[in-house]
Amino acid sequence: MNKCGDSIRVVHPLFQEEGGGSIPTSPLQLHIGEISSKQAILLNELWHSRMPRLDCYAVCKPCFAAEFENIFYAIAMWSLPIAANRLKNGKESLELRRMAIADDAPKNTASRMLKIMTMMIRKQRPDIKRLISYQDTGVHSGTIYAAAGWNPAHKGKYQTWGKHSKRPGQIEQSKSDKVRWEFTL
């Protein structure tokens, strides 16, 4: 883990842009665009409250970041659904694996970012018909999904991967119940 966390938040443009280093006051000020999965994982380690560890450099694509005046304020990482074989048309879906927001990001950053990413994925990936995300009910109420126009599709009780799982040795990151939210493209 990078010990000098502030430095990885800087976008590092080729030329310094104008601006006084102010903090954005509205999510409308944030520019949302794609970043590398490696950069997204580093930022996730800084900001994610419950699941900072994620090692999916080759799996998570696309990854997005929200930035203002060359400073990152949020990231989101997408992949094919982990349980695509259990979902109807799972191969035509993308799962939001992680979304992490800096403490100094403007209010409503998450719902704005969801809305913009939805539009970008729709345009760039016509093969994707549905977006899904699993809400950890232990720490989230689902407000960001509702505000972005997503629908709660399934509520599930916590289940362990179990000792007979195809994922032996996996660390249980959260034992809370989950809500699967969906957005049809």
Where are these regions (language model features)?
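Acyl-donor-binding surface of acyltransferase catalytic domains
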Residues: 1-15
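Short acidic/polar alpha-helix capping motifs at helix-coil junctions
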Residues: 5-7, 26-27, 107-110
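Conserved beta-hairpin
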Residues: 44, 59-77
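An active-site-proximal beta-strand-loop segment
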Residues: 51-57, 61-62, 67, 83-85
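Short hydrophobic/aromatic beta-strand or adjacent loop that forms the aromatic wall/cage
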Residues: 61, 176-180
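Short beta-strand-to-coil "C-cap" segments at the C-terminal boundary of structured domains/repeats
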Residues: 182-185
